[in-house]
């Protein structure tokens, strides 16, 4: 039986560092919000069977998303952290029968709206049948410095270091178990949760264009990338 590929977009964050008057996933770039750009990527991809967005219970912007993408499931059961939001989304997928334990969940940042289709294809093709799952990532290119009191304390050897991106693909059952802990402190992405179970996810070559909208100046680069598509 073919595994389903389900995109899960945690969008309950408020994006404090971005400094806008609304959560950054709802900032408009061009004629669409960041989140709408993200959803378009998954809705256009032939290998993605279902897309789910998990937002905060207090979210007042999600209705516009639902109107623009009526086929997307928008659930208002987000948590206080990304890990809690993903946990709640995966749990509901399993409880409702929309996902089986062996189906693939592709967790993607709501602020990464320039994900190239070919990178998504590569992740699904190379990690979609792997029990350990996998994530998009790129080798660290810049020299890394360790800081202490505003000064360099050491230069970090970057050999073997990769910068994690999203989507991060794992079977629903594995991801559910990985996020079942009551205390999710220190879980910054799905791979880190899975690693705590002793699983070693695959690293799949990502793409430099798949940047995360974090600081206000990132919006300029994102506009250029979206206009180039």
Swiss-Prot record:
Transmembrane segments: none annotated. Its EC number is 2.7.7.60. The record marks 17, 24 as: Transition state stabilizer. The keyword Metal-binding does not apply. Coiled coil: none annotated. PROSITE patterns: ISPD. Keywords: Isoprene biosynthesis, Nucleotidyltransferase, Transferase. This is 2-C-methyl-D-erythritol 4-phosphate cytidylyltransferase.
